[in-house]
Amino acid sequence: MKRRDALKIMGAGVASVFMLNIAPKTHAAILKDREKSKKRLVFYFTATGNSLFIAKQFSDAPLSIPQELKKGNLIYEADEIGFVFPDYAASAPMIVREFIEKAQFKADYIFSVITFGNASVNVAEWWNNFAKGHGLNNNYVNSILMVDNYLPVFDMNEQMKIDKKTDENIATIISDIIARKDFIAPSDMGWFTEDMLKNMQDMHFSQKCNQLIKLDTGRCIECSTCIDVCPRGNFSLTPEGLEYDGKCEFCLACIQNCPQHALSLERERNKDARYRHPDVSLNEIKRANKQ
């Protein structure tokens, strides 16, 4: 065989291996590669896994806000800092607010991604203003539509049937953050008014868990799941059985993750339907929230 022919065969072989084994990187992979060269910290709060799933698109090791709050020195510095959390009544969960109030952050680029299930309304603007009031200046705030896990209003079985185009939307957000885009999502109030939102927030954040959550003692097997997933540590096992008290985050992690459906709200759209993101395990939520 002539040398030139041998080189042609070798070149074809190398090309075929290259084509078989080297696939274009996803946006998430590119972002994680940059995480290795630049220091990026991503903080999240989750109850059913939506926000944790999104946080994992930006970091291989996102940091749980309930766990970070246990630490004494809440001072963070990085090239990029991100926050991922759910929209609660067009605002942030109280535990996220508490973290922002207590911690200090320094970064060249700060981004926030807020998960929601029905209408984002003015949550990006609200969060940007709240954060700015506590010395945190966002370069980028956007929201992403996912399964709505708010049990009083939505049937989880019906929600899971809806294609909310999460993959396409997260790809856009990742592209924005790779480019370090400056963007604050505009408000879309729809039929909501400021007074309506204030009433919703007052109702949502004033709950005590022993008034809100109902326990079916016949179903409860004292498995401790509710204890492990509650970010406020409101549940405990006593000789008399499961007890719970304290100010409720109203995240519904206890109800959604109970394997026996022993916990519920007084009013739900479908008490037989529960939700956890399919790519997030119960153990991940326990590790994120256990007090």
Placement of each model-derived feature along the sequence:
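N-terminal export signals
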Residues: 5-27
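C-terminal segment of N-terminal export signals and the immediately downstream linker at the start
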Residues: 22-47, 53-54, 60
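Flanking helices and flexible, charged tails adjoining ferredoxin-like Fe-S electron-transfer domains
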Residues: 28, 250-291
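Short gly/ser/thr-rich secondary-structure transition/capping motifs
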Residues: 61-69, 238
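Helix-loop-strand module that forms the ligand-binding subsite of alpha/beta enzymes
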Residues: 66-148
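Iron-sulfur cluster-binding cysteine motifs and their immediate structural context
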Residues: 215-216, 221-249, 253-270
